[in-house]
Design a protein with these regions (language model features):
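Hydrophobic anchor residue at the start of the ABC signature
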Residues: 71
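ABC ATPase C-loop
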Residues: 75-76
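Catalytic Walker B motif of ABC-type/P-loop ATPase nucleotide-binding domains
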Residues: 82-86
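Helix N-cap at the start of a conserved alpha-helix in ABC-type nucleotide-binding domains
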Residues: 93-94
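Conserved H-loop
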Residues: 109-115
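Conserved beta-strand-loop-alpha-helix hinge in the C-terminal portion
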Residues: 136-159
Length: 161
């Protein structure tokens, strides 16, 4: 059971935990808990435009910057299984693009399971999509079959515009 905890990490849609830690303090805590050496994070910090926020309490960060702190931690940890709940919520355009790049690269390290209501994030990054309804898998799409139109159809999406 303990081994499974060390093989996964979750980035929640909204996370107010560790609010009295700075990002640097949070990193120290997490890498110690996961028994890992902290790698050089400069590329991730730059990629998410987070340079000026590393010494600010997590509670004082905007929703998007708090999300970036947890995403940077997740990608630096490189767990075998990474859960991302609504990963683009709160992110600016550039950080969203960088997130998509990181998700695509991550496939070399492990598996990402993410939930999203943003079709672009699904169609650009997914190898497999499960459309859920009332907690049950309604339809599955494999790589090459994933399109916004098919997902909309599976969701009975109607565009009233």
């Amino acid at each position: 059971k303990r081994d499974f905890k060390l093989c996964r990490y979750t980035v929640f849609a909204e996370d107010n935990s560790f609010s009295y830690f700075t990002f640097r303090e949070y990193l120290s805590y997490v890498f110690s808990a996961y028994r890992k050496e902290r790698p050089d994070l400069s590329d991730l910090i730059r990629g998410f435009h987070f340079e000026e926020y590393t010494d600010i309490l997590l509670k004082d960060l905007s929703t998007g910057n708090r999300k970036k702190a947890f995403l940077i931690t997740a990608f630096a940890l490189k767990p075998q299984l990474l859960f991302l709940d609504e990963p683009v919520n709160g992110l600016d355009f550039q950080s969203t693009e960088y997130l998509y790049q990181q998700i695509s690269r991550y496939k070399e390290h492990g598996t990402i399971l993410f939930s999203s209501h943003i079709l672009e994030s699904i169609t650009l990054t997914s190898d497999r999509v499960f459309v859920l309804e009332h907690g049950k898998v309604r339809q599955t799409f494999e790589r090459g079959q994933i399109s916004a139109a098919d997902i909309r159809e599976a969701l009975h999406y109607e565009n009233d515009m």
